[in-house]
């Protein structure tokens, strides 16, 4: 399992030698960093794999399984390829990476390397938001070090500018992003002070807090029930017995 993760990390950098990255320097400089959820997980999963922190392992499982399934069932990147024939290797790379972030955490649980607990499901949304801060930091360093150009005044309101993981807003005509935005409080959608006060602009990262906790938490709970339903049922019985003033029978 660890070797799959290491190979995935190597492949992330080796992709710079194949189209479209090898023929587009600007994209190569941008995408060789970890600027989306999958890329950031590719960078961190090899280190998380040997972590003794159970919340970190739970994060690996929930976000790996959920993000992997979404990417495989709705592969936005391959569908958007303008040159399908010329970029076949990158399409294969895309599917390997997203299969990997799904398969390795799943194998960890199935093979007994890690035991899930429904009580730790908040590690999924919390970990995802921390991951987005990691992505945001990557993008800031990219801009400050010259890997991507700094935004000019006209691009200040462009949600789609270098926005690969919804950090800066829901995107333009993006079904998933627009769905997430439905759960965002209105004050996270406008500029509070300054020259552009009152105009619509999503607060970077903050706009995602409510949608992530609202959506990822119940999804993680449903997934946890596949593996930890017995512990949940036992805890429900204990709680019911306590509320009724009875002591549950010990088997």
Task: For the regions a language model picked out, list residue spans one by one.
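A cytosolic-side transmembrane-helix exit/cap motif
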Residues: 24, 78-88, 142-147
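Short juxtamembrane and helix-loop transition motifs at transmembrane-helix boundaries
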Residues: 1, 14-28, 82-85
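Membrane-interface helix-boundary motifs at transmembrane edges
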Residues: 1, 50-58, 111-122
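Short, highly charged, low-complexity non-transmembrane loops/tails of multi-pass membrane proteins
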Residues: 230-251
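Aromatic-anchored segments of alpha-helical transmembrane domains
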Residues: 6-17, 64-76, 128-139
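Alpha-helical transmembrane segments in multipass membrane proteins, preferentially the mid-helix core
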Residues: 42-48, 100-119
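Membrane-embedded alpha-helical segments of multi-pass membrane proteins
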Residues: 31-44, 60, 73, 92-103
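Membrane-interface transmembrane-helix boundary segments in multi-pass integral membrane proteins
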Residues: 119-130, 144-221
């Amino acid at each position: 399992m660890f070797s799959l993760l290491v190979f995935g990390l190597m492949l992330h950098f080796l992709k710079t030698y194949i189209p479209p990255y090898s023929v587009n320097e600007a994209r190569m400089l941008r995408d060789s960093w970890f600027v989306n959820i999958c890329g950031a997980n590719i960078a961190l999963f090899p280190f998380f794999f040997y972590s003794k922190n159970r919340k970190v392992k739970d994060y690996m499982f929930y976000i790996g399984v959920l993000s992997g399934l979404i990417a495989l069932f709705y592969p936005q990147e391959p569908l958007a390829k303008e040159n399908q024939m010329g970029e076949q290797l990158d399409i294969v790379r895309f599917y390997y990476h997203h299969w990997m972030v799904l398969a390795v955490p799943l194998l960890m649980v199935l093979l007994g390397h890690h035991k899930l607990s429904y009580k730790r499901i908040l590690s999924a949304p919390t970990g995802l938001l921390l991951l987005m801060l990691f992505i945001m930091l990557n993008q800031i360093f990219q801009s400050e070090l010259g890997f991507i150009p700094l935004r000019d005044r006209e691009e200040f309101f462009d949600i789609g500018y270098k926005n690969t993981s919804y950090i800066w807003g829901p995107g333009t005509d993006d079904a998933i992003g627009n769905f997430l935005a439905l759960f965002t409080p209105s004050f996270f959608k406008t500029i509070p002070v300054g020259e552009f006060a009152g105009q619509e602009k999503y607060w970077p990262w903050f706009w995602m807090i409510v949608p992530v906790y609202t959506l990822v938490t119940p999804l993680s709970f449903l997934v946890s029930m596949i593996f930890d339903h017995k512990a949940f049922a036992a805890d429900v019985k204990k709680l019911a017995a306590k509320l009724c003033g009875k002591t549950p029978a010990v088997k």
